[in-house]
Protein backbone atom coordinates (compact mmCIF):
# COMPACT_ATOMS: atom_id res chain seq x y z
CA UNK A 1 0.00 0.00 0.00
CA UNK A 2 2.95 2.33 0.66
CA UNK A 3 4.09 1.84 -2.94
CA UNK A 4 0.58 2.63 -4.16
CA UNK A 5 0.39 5.80 -2.07
CA UNK A 6 3.77 6.89 -3.38
CA UNK A 7 2.63 6.23 -6.95
CA UNK A 8 -0.41 8.43 -6.42
CA UNK A 9 1.83 11.19 -5.08
CA UNK A 10 4.09 10.93 -8.13
CA UNK A 11 1.10 11.09 -10.48
CA UNK A 12 -0.26 14.21 -8.80
CA UNK A 13 3.16 15.88 -8.91
CA UNK A 14 3.66 15.00 -12.57
CA UNK A 15 0.20 16.29 -13.45
CA UNK A 16 0.92 19.59 -11.73
CA UNK A 17 3.97 20.06 -13.95
CA UNK A 18 2.26 18.88 -17.15
CA UNK A 19 -0.76 21.06 -16.44
CA UNK A 20 1.41 24.15 -16.86
CA UNK A 21 2.48 23.11 -20.36
CA UNK A 22 0.84 23.58 -23.74
CA UNK A 23 -0.18 20.28 -25.30
CA UNK A 24 0.63 21.54 -28.79
CA UNK A 25 4.21 22.34 -27.74
CA UNK A 26 4.72 18.85 -26.31
CA UNK A 27 4.98 17.51 -29.87
CA UNK A 28 8.08 19.65 -30.37
CA UNK A 29 9.59 18.76 -27.01
CA UNK A 30 8.87 15.03 -27.41
CA UNK A 31 9.73 13.84 -30.94
CA UNK A 32 8.40 10.34 -30.26
CA UNK A 33 5.12 11.51 -28.76
CA UNK A 34 2.84 10.63 -31.66
CA UNK A 35 4.29 7.15 -32.13
CA UNK A 36 4.20 6.40 -28.40
CA UNK A 37 0.60 7.49 -27.98
CA UNK A 38 -1.10 5.98 -31.04
CA UNK A 39 -2.16 2.36 -31.37
CA UNK A 40 -3.85 0.21 -33.99
CA UNK A 41 -5.89 -2.61 -32.49
CA UNK A 42 -8.65 -4.81 -33.94
CA UNK A 43 -9.66 -2.30 -36.62
CA UNK A 44 -9.43 0.70 -34.28
CA UNK A 45 -6.90 3.55 -34.48
CA UNK A 46 -6.48 5.21 -31.09
CA UNK A 47 -4.68 8.55 -30.74
CA UNK A 48 -3.92 9.76 -27.21
CA UNK A 49 -1.27 12.28 -28.24
CA UNK A 50 -3.59 15.27 -27.67
CA UNK A 51 -4.00 14.34 -24.02
CA UNK A 52 -2.56 16.61 -21.33
CA UNK A 53 0.20 14.34 -20.10
CA UNK A 54 3.85 14.75 -20.99
CA UNK A 55 6.43 11.94 -20.98
CA UNK A 56 6.87 12.16 -17.22
CA UNK A 57 3.11 12.19 -16.70
CA UNK A 58 2.64 9.08 -18.82
CA UNK A 59 5.45 7.35 -16.95
CA UNK A 60 3.87 8.26 -13.60
CA UNK A 61 0.48 6.97 -14.79
CA UNK A 62 2.02 3.66 -15.87
CA UNK A 63 3.83 3.39 -12.53
CA UNK A 64 0.46 3.86 -10.82
CA UNK A 65 -1.06 1.05 -12.90
CA UNK A 66 1.78 -1.27 -11.88
CA UNK A 67 1.51 -0.26 -8.22
CA UNK A 68 -2.25 -0.95 -8.27
CA UNK A 69 -1.49 -4.41 -9.74
CA UNK A 70 -3.61 -3.98 -12.85
CA UNK A 71 -1.84 -6.98 -14.37
CA UNK A 72 -2.71 -9.20 -11.43
CA UNK A 73 -6.33 -8.03 -11.41
CA UNK A 74 -6.53 -8.73 -15.14
CA UNK A 75 -5.26 -12.27 -14.57
CA UNK A 76 -7.77 -12.83 -11.78
CA UNK A 77 -10.67 -11.63 -13.93
CA UNK A 78 -9.80 -13.81 -16.92
CA UNK A 79 -9.09 -16.69 -14.51
CA UNK A 80 -12.65 -16.65 -13.22
CA UNK A 81 -11.89 -15.63 -9.65
CA UNK A 82 -14.70 -14.00 -7.67
CA UNK A 83 -13.47 -10.44 -8.15
CA UNK A 84 -17.02 -9.15 -7.60
CA UNK A 85 -16.35 -9.55 -3.91
CA UNK A 86 -19.54 -8.04 -2.50
CA UNK A 87 -21.65 -10.63 -4.33
CA UNK A 88 -19.09 -13.44 -4.39
CA UNK A 89 -19.18 -13.75 -8.17
CA UNK A 90 -16.73 -14.19 -11.00
CA UNK A 91 -16.76 -11.60 -13.79
CA UNK A 92 -16.75 -13.44 -17.11
CA UNK A 93 -18.65 -11.48 -19.72
CA UNK A 94 -15.54 -12.17 -21.80
CA UNK A 95 -16.62 -15.83 -21.94
CA UNK A 96 -19.70 -14.82 -23.91
CA UNK A 97 -17.53 -13.89 -26.89
CA UNK A 98 -14.85 -16.55 -26.43
CA UNK A 99 -14.36 -19.44 -28.86
CA UNK A 100 -16.33 -22.54 -27.94
CA UNK A 101 -13.15 -24.54 -27.29
CA UNK A 102 -11.60 -21.89 -25.01
CA UNK A 103 -10.69 -22.96 -21.48
CA UNK A 104 -12.74 -20.50 -19.41
CA UNK A 105 -13.62 -21.30 -15.81
CA UNK A 106 -15.66 -19.69 -13.06
CA UNK A 107 -14.27 -20.73 -9.71
CA UNK A 108 -12.50 -23.61 -11.43
CA UNK A 109 -15.64 -24.88 -13.19
CA UNK A 110 -15.60 -24.85 -17.04
CA UNK A 111 -18.32 -22.62 -18.50
CA UNK A 112 -17.95 -22.76 -22.28
CA UNK A 113 -20.15 -25.81 -22.80
CA UNK A 114 -23.09 -23.92 -21.27
CA UNK A 115 -22.24 -20.74 -23.16
CA UNK A 116 -22.09 -22.60 -26.46
CA UNK A 117 -25.35 -24.43 -25.74
CA UNK A 118 -27.16 -21.11 -25.34
CA UNK A 119 -25.51 -19.71 -28.48
CA UNK A 120 -26.65 -22.76 -30.46
CA UNK A 121 -30.23 -22.24 -29.24
CA UNK A 122 -30.06 -18.53 -30.03
CA UNK A 123 -28.82 -19.20 -33.54
CA UNK A 124 -31.54 -21.79 -34.19
CA UNK A 125 -34.25 -19.44 -32.91
CA UNK A 126 -32.84 -16.54 -34.92
CA UNK A 127 -32.83 -18.51 -38.15
CA UNK A 128 -36.29 -19.99 -37.52
CA UNK A 129 -37.87 -16.57 -36.98
CA UNK A 130 -36.07 -15.02 -39.94
CA UNK A 131 -37.00 -17.88 -42.28
CA UNK A 132 -40.63 -17.88 -41.18
CA UNK A 133 -40.45 -21.37 -39.66
CA UNK A 134 -41.60 -19.79 -36.39
CA UNK A 135 -44.79 -17.85 -37.03
CA UNK A 136 -47.38 -15.96 -35.07
CA UNK A 137 -50.77 -17.22 -33.94
CA UNK A 138 -52.48 -16.34 -37.23
CA UNK A 139 -49.82 -18.01 -39.36
CA UNK A 140 -48.16 -14.75 -40.37
CA UNK A 141 -44.36 -14.45 -40.14
CA UNK A 142 -42.96 -11.96 -37.67
CA UNK A 143 -42.12 -8.59 -39.18
CA UNK A 144 -41.39 -6.75 -35.95
CA UNK A 145 -39.88 -7.41 -32.54
CA UNK A 146 -40.77 -5.49 -29.39
CA UNK A 147 -37.83 -5.65 -26.98
CA UNK A 148 -38.80 -4.89 -23.37
CA UNK A 149 -36.06 -4.29 -20.80
CA UNK A 150 -34.38 -1.51 -18.84
CA UNK A 151 -30.85 -0.51 -17.91
CA UNK A 152 -28.35 -3.04 -19.22
CA UNK A 153 -31.23 -4.98 -20.75
CA UNK A 154 -32.01 -1.98 -22.94
CA UNK A 155 -29.07 0.38 -23.43
CA UNK A 156 -26.66 -2.20 -24.86
CA UNK A 157 -29.08 -3.91 -27.27
CA UNK A 158 -30.45 -0.54 -28.38
CA UNK A 159 -26.95 0.72 -29.23
CA UNK A 160 -26.12 -2.59 -30.89
CA UNK A 161 -29.20 -2.33 -33.10
CA UNK A 162 -28.34 1.21 -34.13
CA UNK A 163 -24.82 0.11 -35.05
CA UNK A 164 -25.69 -3.05 -36.98
CA UNK A 165 -29.18 -2.56 -38.38
CA UNK A 166 -29.63 -2.84 -42.14
CA UNK A 167 -30.80 0.27 -43.99
CA UNK A 168 -34.02 -1.58 -44.87
CA UNK A 169 -34.47 -4.33 -42.28
CA UNK A 170 -36.76 -7.24 -43.07
CA UNK A 171 -37.63 -7.38 -39.37
CA UNK A 172 -38.13 -4.11 -37.52
CA UNK A 173 -36.94 -3.82 -33.93
CA UNK A 174 -38.53 -1.50 -31.36
CA UNK A 175 -37.59 -0.91 -27.73
CA UNK A 176 -39.63 -0.04 -24.66
CA UNK A 177 -37.83 0.67 -21.40
CA UNK A 178 -39.39 3.43 -19.32
CA UNK A 179 -42.39 2.84 -17.10
CA UNK A 180 -44.21 5.60 -18.95
CA UNK A 181 -47.31 4.65 -20.88
CA UNK A 182 -46.50 7.23 -23.54
CA UNK A 183 -43.40 5.31 -24.64
CA UNK A 184 -45.33 2.07 -24.98
CA UNK A 185 -48.20 3.74 -26.85
CA UNK A 186 -45.94 5.59 -29.28
CA UNK A 187 -43.72 2.56 -29.91
CA UNK A 188 -46.56 0.16 -30.68
CA UNK A 189 -48.90 2.58 -32.46
CA UNK A 190 -48.06 1.35 -35.97
CA UNK A 191 -47.25 -2.28 -35.13
CA UNK A 192 -49.54 -5.18 -36.01
CA UNK A 193 -49.84 -7.56 -33.02
CA UNK A 194 -50.29 -10.49 -35.43
CA UNK A 195 -46.81 -9.83 -36.85
CA UNK A 196 -44.99 -8.79 -33.66
CA UNK A 197 -42.78 -10.93 -31.43
CA UNK A 198 -42.38 -9.62 -27.87
CA UNK A 199 -39.12 -10.42 -26.07
CA UNK A 200 -39.09 -9.62 -22.34
CA UNK A 201 -35.63 -9.24 -20.79
CA UNK A 202 -35.30 -9.60 -17.02
CA UNK A 203 -32.91 -12.05 -15.38
CA UNK A 204 -35.11 -12.50 -12.30
CA UNK A 205 -38.38 -11.57 -14.01
CA UNK A 206 -39.08 -9.20 -11.12
CA UNK A 207 -37.91 -5.84 -12.52
CA UNK A 208 -40.81 -3.46 -11.85
CA UNK A 209 -40.53 -1.31 -14.97
CA UNK A 210 -40.01 -4.28 -17.28
CA UNK A 211 -42.90 -6.27 -15.86
CA UNK A 212 -45.22 -3.28 -16.15
CA UNK A 213 -44.38 -2.95 -19.85
CA UNK A 214 -44.55 -6.72 -20.32
CA UNK A 215 -48.06 -6.74 -18.86
CA UNK A 216 -49.05 -3.93 -21.22
CA UNK A 217 -47.59 -5.85 -24.16
CA UNK A 218 -49.41 -9.02 -23.21
CA UNK A 219 -52.71 -7.13 -22.92
CA UNK A 220 -52.03 -5.55 -26.33
CA UNK A 221 -51.40 -8.97 -27.88
CA UNK A 222 -54.34 -10.61 -26.13
CA UNK A 223 -56.78 -7.95 -27.29
CA UNK A 224 -55.95 -8.85 -30.89
CA UNK A 225 -55.09 -12.56 -30.65
CA UNK A 226 -56.67 -13.93 -27.48
CA UNK A 227 -54.83 -15.24 -24.43
CA UNK A 228 -53.55 -18.43 -26.06
CA UNK A 229 -52.64 -16.63 -29.24
CA UNK A 230 -50.63 -14.08 -27.27
CA UNK A 231 -48.46 -16.87 -25.84
CA UNK A 232 -47.19 -17.67 -29.34
CA UNK A 233 -45.85 -14.13 -29.60
CA UNK A 234 -43.74 -14.22 -26.43
CA UNK A 235 -40.11 -15.03 -25.67
CA UNK A 236 -38.05 -14.16 -22.62
CA UNK A 237 -34.48 -13.70 -21.46
CA UNK A 238 -34.52 -14.87 -17.86
CA UNK A 239 -33.37 -17.52 -15.41
CA UNK A 240 -36.73 -17.64 -13.61
CA UNK A 241 -38.52 -20.37 -15.56
CA UNK A 242 -41.37 -20.57 -13.05
CA UNK A 243 -42.16 -16.89 -13.50
CA UNK A 244 -41.82 -16.90 -17.29
CA UNK A 245 -44.11 -19.94 -17.48
CA UNK A 246 -46.69 -18.18 -15.32
CA UNK A 247 -46.51 -15.25 -17.74
CA UNK A 248 -47.23 -17.57 -20.67
CA UNK A 249 -43.78 -18.02 -22.19
CA UNK A 250 -43.00 -21.56 -23.35
CA UNK A 251 -39.81 -22.96 -21.82
CA UNK A 252 -38.21 -23.47 -25.23
CA UNK A 253 -38.51 -19.73 -25.83
CA UNK A 254 -36.71 -18.75 -22.62
CA UNK A 255 -32.99 -18.05 -22.89
CA UNK A 256 -30.86 -17.64 -19.80
CA UNK A 257 -27.52 -16.21 -18.80
CA UNK A 258 -25.34 -16.45 -15.72
CA UNK A 259 -24.64 -14.70 -12.44
CA UNK A 260 -21.13 -13.94 -13.65
CA UNK A 261 -22.59 -11.62 -16.31
CA UNK A 262 -23.49 -8.20 -14.97
CA UNK A 263 -26.39 -6.34 -16.54
CA UNK A 264 -24.29 -3.58 -18.08
CA UNK A 265 -22.01 -6.22 -19.62
CA UNK A 266 -24.84 -8.44 -20.88
CA UNK A 267 -25.30 -7.28 -24.48
CA UNK A 268 -22.96 -10.13 -25.51
CA UNK A 269 -25.46 -12.66 -24.16
CA UNK A 270 -29.00 -13.75 -24.95
CA UNK A 271 -30.03 -10.26 -23.80
CA UNK A 272 -29.33 -9.22 -27.40
CA UNK A 273 -31.39 -12.03 -28.94
CA UNK A 274 -33.75 -9.44 -30.43
CA UNK A 275 -30.84 -7.82 -32.28
CA UNK A 276 -29.58 -11.19 -33.51
CA UNK A 277 -33.01 -11.97 -34.95
CA UNK A 278 -33.43 -8.55 -36.54
CA UNK A 279 -29.89 -8.34 -37.98
CA UNK A 280 -29.12 -12.00 -38.61
CA UNK A 281 -26.81 -14.38 -36.79
CA UNK A 282 -23.78 -13.58 -38.94
CA UNK A 283 -23.82 -9.96 -37.77
CA UNK A 284 -24.19 -10.91 -34.11
CA UNK A 285 -21.42 -13.49 -34.40
CA UNK A 286 -19.15 -10.86 -35.95
CA UNK A 287 -19.85 -8.61 -32.98
CA UNK A 288 -18.72 -11.39 -30.63
CA UNK A 289 -15.58 -11.93 -32.70
CA UNK A 290 -14.66 -8.26 -32.46
CA UNK A 291 -15.03 -8.32 -28.70
CA UNK A 292 -12.86 -11.43 -28.50
CA UNK A 293 -10.14 -9.73 -30.55
CA UNK A 294 -10.02 -6.83 -28.09
CA UNK A 295 -10.01 -9.31 -25.18
CA UNK A 296 -6.88 -10.93 -26.61
CA UNK A 297 -5.17 -7.56 -26.92
CA UNK A 298 -6.12 -6.49 -23.39
CA UNK A 299 -5.06 -9.82 -21.91
CA UNK A 300 -1.70 -10.06 -23.68
CA UNK A 301 -0.40 -6.56 -24.44
CA UNK A 302 2.02 -4.89 -22.00
CA UNK A 303 0.53 -1.96 -20.13
CA UNK A 304 2.46 0.68 -22.09
CA UNK A 305 1.04 -0.66 -25.38
CA UNK A 306 -2.39 -1.64 -24.09
CA UNK A 307 -5.24 0.43 -25.53
CA UNK A 308 -7.68 -0.03 -22.65
CA UNK A 309 -4.99 0.66 -20.07
CA UNK A 310 -3.80 3.84 -21.77
CA UNK A 311 -7.31 5.24 -22.25
CA UNK A 312 -8.04 4.50 -18.59
CA UNK A 313 -4.81 6.17 -17.49
CA UNK A 314 -5.61 9.26 -19.56
CA UNK A 315 -8.89 9.58 -17.71
CA UNK A 316 -7.22 9.04 -14.33
CA UNK A 317 -4.58 11.64 -15.20
CA UNK A 318 -7.34 14.11 -16.03
CA UNK A 319 -9.63 13.18 -13.15
CA UNK A 320 -7.15 12.81 -10.33
CA UNK A 321 -4.14 14.73 -11.55
CA UNK A 322 -5.88 17.73 -13.10
CA UNK A 323 -9.26 17.60 -11.30
CA UNK A 324 -11.33 17.28 -14.48
CA UNK A 325 -14.58 15.86 -13.16
CA UNK A 326 -16.48 15.35 -16.41
CA UNK A 327 -15.76 13.86 -19.82
CA UNK A 328 -17.65 14.30 -23.06
CA UNK A 329 -17.90 11.41 -25.52
CA UNK A 330 -18.80 12.55 -29.02
CA UNK A 331 -19.32 9.98 -31.79
CA UNK A 332 -19.21 11.49 -35.27
CA UNK A 333 -21.51 8.72 -36.46
CA UNK A 334 -25.29 8.72 -36.46
CA UNK A 335 -25.29 4.98 -35.82
CA UNK A 336 -23.24 5.50 -32.65
CA UNK A 337 -25.29 8.43 -31.36
CA UNK A 338 -26.33 6.52 -28.20
CA UNK A 339 -22.75 5.66 -27.24
CA UNK A 340 -22.57 8.23 -24.45
CA UNK A 341 -25.82 6.94 -22.92
CA UNK A 342 -24.40 3.42 -22.93
CA UNK A 343 -21.14 4.60 -21.38
CA UNK A 344 -22.99 6.51 -18.69
CA UNK A 345 -24.23 3.22 -17.31
CA UNK A 346 -21.06 1.26 -18.03
CA UNK A 347 -18.71 3.74 -16.38
CA UNK A 348 -20.79 5.61 -13.82
CA UNK A 349 -22.64 2.57 -12.48
CA UNK A 350 -19.41 0.58 -12.39
CA UNK A 351 -17.12 3.14 -10.79
CA UNK A 352 -19.38 5.79 -9.28
CA UNK A 353 -18.55 4.67 -5.76
CA UNK A 354 -17.01 6.24 -2.67
CA UNK A 355 -16.37 3.06 -0.66
CA UNK A 356 -14.01 0.23 -1.55
CA UNK A 357 -14.46 -3.54 -1.15
CA UNK A 358 -12.88 -3.31 2.31
CA UNK A 359 -15.70 -1.05 3.50
CA UNK A 360 -13.41 1.97 3.78
CA UNK A 361 -13.81 5.30 2.02
CA UNK A 362 -11.70 5.59 -1.11
CA UNK A 363 -8.83 8.05 -1.00
CA UNK A 364 -9.19 9.50 -4.49
CA UNK A 365 -11.97 10.76 -6.74
CA UNK A 366 -13.64 8.06 -8.80
CA UNK A 367 -15.91 8.07 -11.87
CA UNK A 368 -16.25 11.21 -13.93
CA UNK A 369 -19.61 12.42 -15.17
CA UNK A 370 -19.99 11.15 -18.74
CA UNK A 371 -22.10 13.07 -21.23
CA UNK A 372 -22.24 13.51 -24.95
CA UNK A 373 -24.23 13.26 -28.13
CA UNK A 374 -23.84 13.03 -31.86
CA UNK A 375 -21.28 15.11 -33.74
CA UNK A 376 -21.53 17.42 -35.60
CA UNK A 377 -24.85 18.31 -33.92
CA UNK A 378 -23.24 19.05 -30.57
CA UNK A 379 -21.02 21.69 -32.16
CA UNK A 380 -24.19 23.77 -32.30
CA UNK A 381 -25.19 22.93 -28.74
CA UNK A 382 -22.67 22.63 -25.90
CA UNK A 383 -19.35 22.99 -27.73
CA UNK A 384 -19.33 26.71 -26.94
CA UNK A 385 -18.75 25.63 -23.35
CA UNK A 386 -16.10 23.10 -24.38
CA UNK A 387 -14.07 25.76 -26.19
CA UNK A 388 -14.52 28.84 -24.00
CA UNK A 389 -16.11 27.74 -20.73
CA UNK A 390 -14.46 28.25 -17.35
CA UNK A 391 -14.06 24.50 -16.76
CA UNK A 392 -11.88 22.31 -18.96
CA UNK A 393 -13.68 19.13 -19.99
CA UNK A 394 -11.64 16.40 -21.72
CA UNK A 395 -13.31 14.98 -24.81
CA UNK A 396 -13.31 11.64 -26.53
CA UNK A 397 -14.06 11.65 -30.24
CA UNK A 398 -15.17 8.51 -32.07
CA UNK A 399 -15.15 8.53 -35.87
CA UNK A 400 -15.26 6.20 -38.86
CA UNK A 401 -12.41 6.31 -41.36
CA UNK A 402 -14.71 5.12 -44.13
CA UNK A 403 -18.45 4.93 -44.65
CA UNK A 404 -20.40 3.95 -47.75
CA UNK A 405 -23.74 5.16 -46.39
CA UNK A 406 -25.41 8.33 -47.57
CA UNK A 407 -24.76 10.74 -50.43
CA UNK A 408 -21.22 11.09 -51.79
CA UNK A 409 -19.08 13.68 -50.05
CA UNK A 410 -21.00 13.85 -46.79
CA UNK A 411 -18.64 11.61 -44.87
CA UNK A 412 -15.65 13.77 -45.78
CA UNK A 413 -17.49 16.79 -44.39
CA UNK A 414 -18.16 14.89 -41.17
CA UNK A 415 -14.51 13.90 -40.85
CA UNK A 416 -13.35 17.46 -41.49
CA UNK A 417 -15.48 18.57 -38.57
CA UNK A 418 -14.20 16.04 -36.05
CA UNK A 419 -10.57 16.68 -37.00
CA UNK A 420 -11.09 20.44 -36.82
CA UNK A 421 -12.72 20.26 -33.40
CA UNK A 422 -9.92 18.18 -31.89
CA UNK A 423 -7.27 20.51 -33.29
CA UNK A 424 -9.13 23.69 -32.33
CA UNK A 425 -9.61 22.48 -28.78
CA UNK A 426 -5.88 21.88 -28.48
CA UNK A 427 -4.34 24.87 -30.28
CA UNK A 428 -7.00 27.51 -29.61
CA UNK A 429 -6.67 31.01 -31.03
CA UNK A 430 -4.66 33.84 -29.54
CA UNK A 431 -5.87 37.36 -28.92
CA UNK A 432 -3.11 38.56 -31.23
CA UNK A 433 -4.47 36.49 -34.12
CA UNK A 434 -7.97 37.81 -33.50
CA UNK A 435 -6.66 41.37 -33.28
CA UNK A 436 -4.85 41.03 -36.61
CA UNK A 437 -8.02 39.79 -38.29
CA UNK A 438 -10.15 42.59 -36.84
CA UNK A 439 -7.62 45.26 -37.84
CA UNK A 440 -7.67 43.91 -41.40
CA UNK A 441 -11.44 44.29 -41.38
CA UNK A 442 -11.17 47.92 -40.31
CA UNK A 443 -12.63 47.47 -36.83
CA UNK A 444 -11.84 50.34 -34.47
CA UNK A 445 -9.36 49.97 -31.62
CA UNK A 446 -12.14 50.58 -29.10
CA UNK A 447 -14.18 47.70 -30.49
CA UNK A 448 -11.13 45.46 -30.78
CA UNK A 449 -10.42 45.97 -27.09
CA UNK A 450 -13.73 44.33 -26.19
CA UNK A 451 -14.17 41.92 -29.12
CA UNK A 452 -10.73 40.32 -29.25
CA UNK A 453 -10.87 38.70 -25.78
CA UNK A 454 -14.33 37.33 -26.55
CA UNK A 455 -13.20 35.77 -29.82
CA UNK A 456 -9.99 34.26 -28.48
CA UNK A 457 -9.77 30.57 -27.58
CA UNK A 458 -7.47 29.48 -24.77
CA UNK A 459 -7.06 26.00 -26.25
CA UNK A 460 -5.09 23.36 -24.34
CA UNK A 461 -8.26 21.27 -24.05
CA UNK A 462 -7.28 17.57 -24.07
CA UNK A 463 -8.95 14.96 -26.24
CA UNK A 464 -8.65 11.38 -27.43
CA UNK A 465 -9.49 10.24 -30.96
CA UNK A 466 -10.79 6.72 -31.64
CA UNK A 467 -11.18 5.93 -35.34
CA UNK A 468 -12.84 2.73 -36.57
CA UNK A 469 -11.65 1.58 -40.00
CA UNK A 470 -15.31 1.04 -40.83
CA UNK A 471 -18.35 0.42 -38.68
CA UNK A 472 -18.68 -3.36 -38.94
CA UNK A 473 -19.92 -5.91 -36.39
CA UNK A 474 -16.28 -6.71 -35.65
CA UNK A 475 -15.04 -3.16 -35.10
CA UNK A 476 -18.11 -2.29 -33.04
CA UNK A 477 -17.51 -5.33 -30.85
CA UNK A 478 -13.90 -4.27 -30.39
CA UNK A 479 -14.99 -0.74 -29.44
CA UNK A 480 -17.42 -1.88 -26.75
CA UNK A 481 -14.93 -4.38 -25.31
CA UNK A 482 -12.31 -1.60 -25.25
CA UNK A 483 -14.56 0.55 -23.07
CA UNK A 484 -15.41 -2.38 -20.81
CA UNK A 485 -11.74 -3.09 -20.13
CA UNK A 486 -11.00 0.62 -19.68
CA UNK A 487 -13.69 0.78 -17.02
CA UNK A 488 -12.25 -2.28 -15.27
CA UNK A 489 -8.73 -0.80 -15.19
CA UNK A 490 -10.03 2.44 -13.70
CA UNK A 491 -11.89 0.56 -10.99
CA UNK A 492 -8.77 -1.40 -10.08
CA UNK A 493 -6.70 1.77 -9.74
CA UNK A 494 -9.38 3.66 -7.83
CA UNK A 495 -9.87 0.69 -5.53
CA UNK A 496 -13.58 0.06 -6.11
CA UNK A 497 -15.61 -2.99 -7.14
CA UNK A 498 -16.68 -2.19 -10.69
CA UNK A 499 -19.20 -5.03 -10.83
CA UNK A 500 -21.85 -4.30 -8.20
CA UNK A 501 -24.37 -1.44 -8.07
CA UNK A 502 -25.77 -1.01 -4.58
CA UNK A 503 -26.48 2.64 -5.33
CA UNK A 504 -29.52 1.77 -7.44
CA UNK A 505 -31.28 -0.19 -4.69
CA UNK A 506 -32.52 2.48 -2.27
CA UNK A 507 -34.64 4.28 -4.84
CA UNK A 508 -36.26 0.99 -5.88
CA UNK A 509 -37.23 0.20 -2.29
CA UNK A 510 -38.64 3.66 -1.67
CA UNK A 511 -40.60 3.64 -4.95
CA UNK A 512 -42.21 0.38 -3.86
CA UNK A 513 -43.32 2.05 -0.66
CA UNK A 514 -44.57 5.25 -2.29
CA UNK A 515 -46.67 3.59 -5.02
CA UNK A 516 -49.42 2.30 -2.67
CA UNK A 517 -49.39 5.66 -0.90
CA UNK A 518 -50.07 7.41 -4.22
CA UNK A 519 -52.87 4.94 -4.93
CA UNK A 520 -54.47 5.29 -1.50
CA UNK A 521 -53.77 8.98 -1.06
CA UNK A 522 -52.41 8.35 2.44
CA UNK A 523 -48.77 9.37 2.70
CA UNK A 524 -46.59 7.56 5.21
CA UNK A 525 -43.62 9.01 7.04
CA UNK A 526 -41.67 11.27 4.70
CA UNK A 527 -39.90 14.59 4.73
CA UNK A 528 -42.33 17.54 4.36
CA UNK A 529 -41.49 18.08 0.67
CA UNK A 530 -42.08 14.45 -0.35
CA UNK A 531 -45.27 14.22 1.74
CA UNK A 532 -46.64 17.36 0.05
CA UNK A 533 -45.80 15.99 -3.39
CA UNK A 534 -47.54 12.69 -2.64
CA UNK A 535 -50.60 14.65 -1.58
CA UNK A 536 -50.49 16.69 -4.77
CA UNK A 537 -49.90 13.73 -7.10
CA UNK A 538 -52.14 11.11 -5.47
CA UNK A 539 -54.16 9.11 -7.96
UniProtKB/Swiss-Prot annotation:
Pathway, per record: Carbohydrate biosynthesis; gluconeogenesis; Carbohydrate degradation; glycolysis; D-glyceraldehyde 3-phosphate and glycerone phosphate from D-glucose: step 2/4
Species of origin: Caulobacter sp. (strain K31)
Annotated NCBIfam families: PRK00179.1 (NF001211)
Protein name: Glucose-6-phosphate isomerase
Record has Isomerase as a keyword: yes
UniProt-recorded Gene Ontology molecular function terms: carbohydrate derivative binding; glucose-6-phosphate isomerase activity; monosaccharide binding
Source taxon at top rank: Bacteria
Compartments where found: Cytoplasm
Catalytic residues identified in the record: 349 (proton donor), 380, 508
Keywords: Cytoplasm, Gluconeogenesis, Glycolysis, Isomerase
Family label: Belongs to the GPI family.
Gene Ontology terms: biological process: gluconeogenesis; glucose 6-phosphate metabolic process; glycolytic process
EC number of this enzyme: 5.3.1.9
InterPro entries documented for this protein: G6P_Isomerase, G6P_Isomerase_C, Phosphoglucose_isomerase_CS, SIS_dom_sf, SIS_PGI_1, SIS_PGI_2
Disulphide bridges: none
Coiled-coil intervals, chain numbering: none
Cited function: Catalyzes the reversible isomerization of glucose-6-phosphate to fructose-6-phosphate.
GO cellular component: cytosol
Keyword presence, Cytoplasm: yes
Catalytic activity, reaction form: alpha-D-glucose 6-phosphate = beta-D-fructose 6-phosphate
